């Protein structure tokens, strides 16, 4: 989704808030060059631990630094994953200036090629009638996504990065994790886990680990299908 302006100057109706709401928190308005952000999205230990250390997507999706009040980058040394912000939409790379405190021109992904590859792999994994050739192709598409994530050539097999072909069930579980790694913070995960019938169980697992301060003022008013088990 393309946003052309930032609500400053001529193009005032084509702006978004990508990075302003879901960037690395920085609220010192005296440093506009950094880019104001309320930092409303943080990581979870589950998400962080899905990545291997040499997966380049981890420290891009989950910021490994924060900003001081003066706009200096400060590395995060704590093992507390709850304090790490979404890093995928960083305002420091925003080209349109002056930067606004309310809107940005940062685009938001609607459909990426890696998503298409993973959709193919999932469709093959979910189909009991999938043929051997389709399964091989599905693993290849999955591994292309992984190779890119590790900074490797997408068309060249890489030992230690590529997943071996181990059947449909293993493929589906691998796709579930890979969609999180590749498409994190892109507003797809909820629909994914609803589609897999895992929404309720996953929310319950998060509920017992999330810091109490995050949930003390909220309570459930409705469930999202499929219906939760008793």
Regions found by a protein language model. Give the residues of each.
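Residue-level signal for threonine
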Residues: 43-44, 135
């Amino acid at each position: 989704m393309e946003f052309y302006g930032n609500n400053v100057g001529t193009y005032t109706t084509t702006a978004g808030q990508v990075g302003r709401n879901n960037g690395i928190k920085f609220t010192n308005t005296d440093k506009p060059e950094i880019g104001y952000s309320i930092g409303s999205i943080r990581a979870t230990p589950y998400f962080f631990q899905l990545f291997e250390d040499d997966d380049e997507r981890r420290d891009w999706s989950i910021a490994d630094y924060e900003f001081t009040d003066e706009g200096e980058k400060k590395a995060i040394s704590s093992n507390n994953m709850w304090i790490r912000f979404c890093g995928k939409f960083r305002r420091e790379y925003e080209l349109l200036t002056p930067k606004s405190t309310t809107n940005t021109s940062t685009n938001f992904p609607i459909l990426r090629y890696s998503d298409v590859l993973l959709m193919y792999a999932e469709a093959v994994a979910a189909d009991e009638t999938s043929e051997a050739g389709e399964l091989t192709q599905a693993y290849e598409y999955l591994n292309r996504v992984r190779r890119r994530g590790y900074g490797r050539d997408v068309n060249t097999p890489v030992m230690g990065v590529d997943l071996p072909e181990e059947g449909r069930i293993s493929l589906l579980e691998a796709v579930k994790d890979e969609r999180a790694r590749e498409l994190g913070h892109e507003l797809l995960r909820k629909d994914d886990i609803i589609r897999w019938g895992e929404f309720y169980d996953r929310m319950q697992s998060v509920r017992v680990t999330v810091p109490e301060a995050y949930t003390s003022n909220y309570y459930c008013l409705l469930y999202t299908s499929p219906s939760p088990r008793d």
